[in-house]
Amino acid sequence: MPKLKTKSSAKKRFKITASGKVVAAQSTKRHGMTKRSKRSLRTRRGTALMSAADTRIVAPFMPYGL
């Protein structure tokens, strides 16, 4: 059976932890941030664990768990 390819878009956006959880950057930080509160912007720094439902969608894109 041939090797499976990893989706390039997924490997740029997501990381899989050793326990199999998917980590991604926080959303809502591209533009229009002057309307948002400082607290809202602070909480969107860094990364966050994705929900189980989203993990099931993303995991097949990275068969070898980059």
Curated annotation (Swiss-Prot):
Its lineage reads:
Bacteria, Pseudomonadati, Pseudomonadota, Alphaproteobacteria, Rickettsiales
Basic residues: which segments have biased composition? 28-45
What would be one Pfam family of this protein?
A: Ribosomal_L35p
Recorded source organism is Anaplasma phagocytophilum (strain HZ)
A single cellular component GO annotation: ribonucleoprotein complex
Q: Name one GO molecular function term.
A: structural constituent of ribosome
Cited InterPro entries: Ribosomal_bL35, Ribosomal_bL35-like, Ribosomal_bL35_CS, Ribosomal_bL35_sf
Q: Name one GO biological process term.
A: translation
- Indicate yes or no for the key word NAD: no
* Protein name (database record): Large ribosomal subunit protein bL35
What UniProt keywords are attached to this protein's entry? Answer: Ribonucleoprotein, Ribosomal protein
Identify the stretch annotated as signal peptide in this record: none
Q: Family assignment? A: Belongs to the bacterial ribosomal protein bL35 family.
Q: Where is this region: Disordered?
A: 19-45
Q: Which gene encodes it?
A: rpmI
